[in-house]
């Protein structure tokens, strides 16, 4: 387990636990509702067993500010169906960043990237990566402003192994090189 603390705003990054399960899904639902208002690709209902596995394997994370979950996300060291041949690279992959609406606009992606850089080094990884679906221009620009390099669009070949929102077969890929 890797925990980060930002003393300026008392932000803590730590692993989610099963006690956070309902809150994680509440934040996923809030993210989907927000996506609906922006006319972008909307997240589906995610598999509860997937999230339980991520929690059990210490791959589900949260930002906590004053005892409130402000943001959640998941990590993995492999993402073959999205990154295909680049999956062989030593990388941390970030998935499903969902922000508590009360904390929207706090630039958690910057904090997550800062944390992920340290986490990657501790785990002998050389890249921090994430992806998004659809043509959400503002989100693409936001990830770039946060420090990620936009690598372009990948035309996915094995979408049957991915959640429903990947059905278009196109993923926007982002990377930070350590």
What are these regions (language model features)?
Residues 18, 29-102, 110-115, 177-178:
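Acetyl-CoA-dependent GNAT
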Residues 133-135, 146, 156-178:
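C-terminal "cap" of GNAT-fold acetyltransferases
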Residues 2-10:
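Short, Lys/Arg-enriched N-terminal segments with co-localized hydrophobic residues
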Residues 104, 113-121, 144:
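A conserved short alpha-helix in the GNAT/GCN5 acetyltransferase fold that borders
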Residues 12-26:
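A short beta-loop-alpha structural element at the N-terminal edge
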Residues 143-153:
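Conserved acetyl-CoA-binding loop of GNAT-fold acetyltransferases
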Residues 120-132:
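Conserved GNAT acetyl-CoA-binding A-motif
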């Amino acid at each position: 387990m890797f925990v980060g603390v930002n003393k300026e705003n008392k932000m803590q990054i730590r692993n989610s636990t099963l006690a956070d399960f309902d809150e994680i899904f509440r934040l996923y639902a809030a993210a989907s509702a927000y996506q609906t208002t922006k006319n972008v690709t909307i997240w589906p209902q995610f598999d509860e067993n997937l999230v339980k596995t991520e929690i059990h394997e210490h791959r589900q994370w949260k930002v906590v500010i004053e005892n409130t979950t402000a943001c959640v996300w998941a990590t993995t060291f492999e993402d073959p169906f999205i990154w295909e041949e680049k999956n062989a690279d030593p990388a941390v992959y970030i998935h499903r960043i969902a922000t508590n609406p009360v904390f929207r606009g706090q630039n958690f992606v910057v904090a997550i990237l800062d944390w992920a850089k340290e986490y990657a080094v501790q785990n002998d990884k050389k890249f921090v990566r994430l992806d998004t679906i659809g043509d959400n221009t503002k989100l693409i620009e936001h990830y770039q402003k946060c420090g990620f390099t936009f690598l372009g669009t990948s035309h996915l070949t094995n979408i049957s192994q991915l959640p429903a929102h990947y059905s278009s077969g196109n993923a926007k890929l982002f990377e930070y090189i350590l």
